């Protein structure tokens, strides 16, 4: 697990999730989606009121580096321990984020 922060911007403004994260199983499609599972997380913003959402833009902050998220569609699911974020990119990111923690 690694410390990770995702900032997403949509019609409701800016929303974030940060905490301990690891890659979740991801389908082998292009552009490669981002599936991440968070534990011990903190969420802020209105985006989390919806289970499915449109993303205008965003970024992933990991290990002192930033990775852009282009326009995308997203979903999230939550159980008692973790929240899984799924981001389906509409195009490949200029600087793709590596899910290999």
UniProtKB/Swiss-Prot annotation:
Instruction: Supply one GO CC term from the record.
Output: extracellular matrix
Organism's domain of life?
A: Eukaryota
Membrane-spanning ranges: none
One of the GO biological process terms: culmination involved in sorocarp development
Give any Pfam family that matches.
Dicty_CAD
Give the UniProt family note.
Answer: Belongs to the csb family.
**Under which name does UniProt file this protein?**
Contact site B protein C
Q: State the organism named in the record.
A: Dictyostelium discoideum
User: What does UniProt list as this organism's lineage?
Assistant: Eukaryota, Amoebozoa, Evosea, Eumycetozoa, Dictyostelia
């Amino acid at each position: 697990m690694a410390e990770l922060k995702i900032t997403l911007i949509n019609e409701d403004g800016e929303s974030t999730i940060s905490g301990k994260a690891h890659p979740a199983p991801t389908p082998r499609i292009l552009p490669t989606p981002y599936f991440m599972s968070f534990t011990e997380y903190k969420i802020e913003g209105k985006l989390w009121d919806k289970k499915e959402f449109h993303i205008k833009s965003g970024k992933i902050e990991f290990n002192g580096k930033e990775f852009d998220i282009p326009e995308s569609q997203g979903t999230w699911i939550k159980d008692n321990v973790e929240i899984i974020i799924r981001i389906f990119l509409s195009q490949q990111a200029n600087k793709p984020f590596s899910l290999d923690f």
